[in-house]
Amino acid sequence: MLAMSNADMVQTMQMNDAASTGSLLLDQFEWRHDGGDDAAVWEGEAWYGDDYDKLWLRTEGERLQGITEDARVELLWDRIVSRWWSLQTGTREDFGDGPPRSWAALGVQGLAPYWFEVEATAYAGDAGRTAARVKIEYDLRLTQRLVVQPEAEANLYGKADPARQLGAGLADLDMGLRLRYEIRREFAPYFGVAWRRLCGETAAYARAQNLGASELQWVAGLRLWF
């Protein structure tokens, strides 16, 4: 997820080569419903810097019945390495259900062919823990105001972390499809569906607690950009 699309970012860079600027995007601020307990989910980021170097702050998480189930915050230094790609390094903090975890992060962010927005990051934590995360998004503009946004995300872990109910290997797959209406570019209500599938050992942890390994949820929310 990018604070603005990389195409917009390149246009901004061409208009103003030297100035430092910033942006704040709350890409998902939504309510999710699957017939059971409703959840509040957020995903957002902010950045500040010039054309070549930026400081990024990313956060995402989920609250269920007033309790933070899972959340993460990343602080990253972003360096442009080509017209469409940047290298990112920094830290990530996980909190919520289970003990907190700290990670060092190294990844890339940019535009793949056909304007797919890609984030791919590797992580190293204490006690020999490793992880990886890949996310792909695409904005399909139907009209000047209507935009369809499909997305997919995968999380992998190098070793099991029973305290956080995470298994080794592919832990989960998340896919979503949202239709937003841009009343203004900075303010867009949306609705859609989100699907999550727990995999391998992570799914086994869930089943041991009589929880399902997959869920399909209706979502409705706001996208805000400052």
Predicted regions and their residues:
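Outer-membrane beta-barrel initiation region
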Residues: M1-I67, A71, L75, R79, ...
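Residues that define the transmembrane beta-barrel architecture of outer-membrane proteins
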Residues: S20-G22, D38-W42, E69-V73, P100-A104, ...
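Transmembrane beta-barrel strands of outer-membrane/channel proteins
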Residues: Q28, L57-G61, T89-E93, A120-A124, ...
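Residue-level signature of outer-membrane beta-barrel architecture
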Residues: Y48-D50, R79, G110, A124, ...
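Repeated loop/turn-to-beta-strand initiation elements of outer-membrane beta-barrel proteins
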Residues: D51-L57, R83-L87, Y114-V118, T143-V148, ...
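Extracellular loop and loop/strand-boundary signature of outer-membrane beta-barrel proteins
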Residues: E60-R63, R92-D94, A105, A120-A122, ...
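Detector for outer-membrane/organellar transmembrane beta-barrel domains
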Residues: P100-P162
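Outer-membrane beta-barrel "beta-signal"
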Residues: G176-E182, G212-F226
